Swiss-Prot record:
Catalyzes the NADPH-dependent reduction of L-glutamate 5-phosphate into L-glutamate 5-semialdehyde and phosphate. The product spontaneously undergoes cyclization to form 1-pyrroline-5-carboxylate. Its EC number is 1.2.1.41. InterPro entries: Ald_DH/histidinol_DH, Ald_DH_C, Ald_DH_N, Aldehyde_DH_dom, G-glutamylP_reductase_CS, Glu-5-SA_DH, GPR_dom. Its main location: cytoplasm. One of its GO terms (biological process) is L-proline biosynthetic process. This is Gamma-glutamyl phosphate reductase. One of its GO terms (cellular component) is cytoplasm. It catalyses: L-glutamate 5-semialdehyde + phosphate + NADP(+) = L-glutamyl 5-phosphate + NADPH + H(+). Belongs to the gamma-glutamyl phosphate reductase family.
């Protein structure tokens, strides 16, 4: 039996065991897990330090190390996310619709678990707990495969979860970690159609593309964030400055951070010096600029075609000058990763057009794209941000981890 077959069989059995759990039992488990994460934070941080030390030895960038790092404060945040999931309404068993048909059959459509979820993700170890809490709340078993850079952190977090499951009398195989981060095993997991009901990749463009090309199990595509902010001709420039600085510098390593700035030519000459001076006071940002805007910056490099298609996840921002709203919309739809896009404008009609015509899961008017987040949207911890249109789109909370089933009751009807 291969490693993937063993994980798959255990996960499938756990998914059946989970079907009988009540909302109360699930919430008790999550509440206890939140406490255990805090109590065992020293152990988790010690294991995380092993990953951080290796990252530094390998010359990983400051931004990527930040994605990997766990502190007492961050573990507290993870714990609070678990508690929030416990407090959310349980979607399992909810009636979507019900009716009696012409044959007298009583037909009810209810929400049910997906079954076994596999998740392949990179760097951020908090994903282990976020994904488990959402899967468990929806009676799903989950197989996790993190990146090798976060292996010790993920092992520690999954160990804490499994210990809590055992202590409360649940099947610990409700969560399993693929501890060998080899590409061959990852590809085997992508092909485990006998066991895995859905695969959710969460990471960079290379990971997402690999999964799209090689997966045989159903996939919900998430999260590459080539995010644009368009500063319109009518924009409040002080507002635009604040939004761009927040979206780019607050946490550049996340998928809802801005990667590209589009500026209307009528405001470029005034806005660029305003932005450049203000952003320098926060953090040095490298601007990669088109020919039209290059001379307006004190410090910039010429942009390449590839820059406009890149999720930098760093203090880098591509810049494009446009002559109209039409050009801005066309440009963004050409390069968007369908995640989050924003416009800063005073023009209501421009705002409405932008929101209707931009092909993305979340489209903002006069606000930072950093808000695209399950917690912010009231969904609790998210399992990912879907950039596709089938099944789920945008931040995926509990409902995105459910399917539906028809329950039909009769009294002897046969079809004539």
């Amino acid at each position: 039996m291969t490693i993937i077959e063993e994980l798959g069989k255990k996960a499938k059995q756990a998914s059946y065991d989970l079907l009988g759990l009540s909302t109360i039992e699930k919430n008790q488990m999550l509440t206890q897990l939140a406490k255990d994460l805090i109590e065992k934070s020293d152990f988790i941080i010690d294991e995380n330090q092993k990953d951080l030390q290796k990252a530094e030895e390998n010359g990983i960038s400051e931004v990527m190390v930040d994605r990997l790092k766990l502190t007492a404060e961050r573990i507290k945040g993870i714990s609070e996310g678990v508690l929030q999931v416990a407090e959310l309404e349980d979607p399992i068993g909810q009636v979507i619709k019900g009716y009696t048909n012409l044959d007298g059959l009583k037909i009810v459509q209810k929400r049910v678990p997906l079954g076994v979820i596999a998740m392949i993700f990179e760097s951020r170890p908090n994903v282990s707990v976020d994904a488990f809490s959402l899967a468990f709340k929806t009676n799903n078993a989950i197989i996790l495969r993190g990146g090798r850079d976060a292996l010790h952190s993920n092992m520690a977090l999954v160990q804490v979860i499994r210990e809590t499951l055992i202590r409360l009398g649940h099947n610990p195989d409700a969560v399993q970690l693929l501890e060998d981060p080899s590409h061959d095993l990852a590809e085997a997991l992508m092909s485990a159609t006998e066991y895995v009901d859905v695969l959710i990749p969460r990471g960079g463009a290379k990971l997402i593309q690999t999964v799209k090309e090689k997966a045989k199990v159903p996939v919900i595509e998430t999260g590459v964030g080539n995010v644009h902010i368009y500063v319109d001709a009518t924009a409040d420039l002080e507002m635009a400055k604040s939004i761009v600085i927040n979206a780019k510098t607050q946490r550049p390593s996340v998928c809802n951070a801005a990667e590209s700035l589009i500026i209307h030519e009528e405001v470029a000459e005034n806005f660029i010096p305003l932005l450049e001076d203000a952003i320098e006071a926060v953090h040095k940002v490298e601007f990669r600029v088109d020919d039209k805007g290059y001379s307006l910056f004190k410090h910039a490099v010429k942009a390449t075609e590839n820059d406009y298609a890149t999720e930098f996840l760093d203090y880098i921002l591509s810049v494009k000058i446009v002559s109209s709203l039409d050009e801005a919309i066309s440009w963004i739809n050409r390069y968007t990763s369908h995640h989050s896009e924003a416009i800063v404008t005073r023009d209501i009609q421009a705002a409405e057009r932008f929101q209707e015509e931009i092909d993305a899961a979340a489209v903002y008017v006069n606000a930072s794209t950093r808000f695209t987040d399950g917690f912010v949207f009231g969904l609790g911890a998210e399992i990912g941000i879907s950039t596709q249109k089938m099944h789920a789109r945008g931040p995926m909370g509990l409902e995105a981890l459910t399917s539906s089933k028809y329950y039909i009751n009769g009294n002897g009807q046969i079809r004539e």
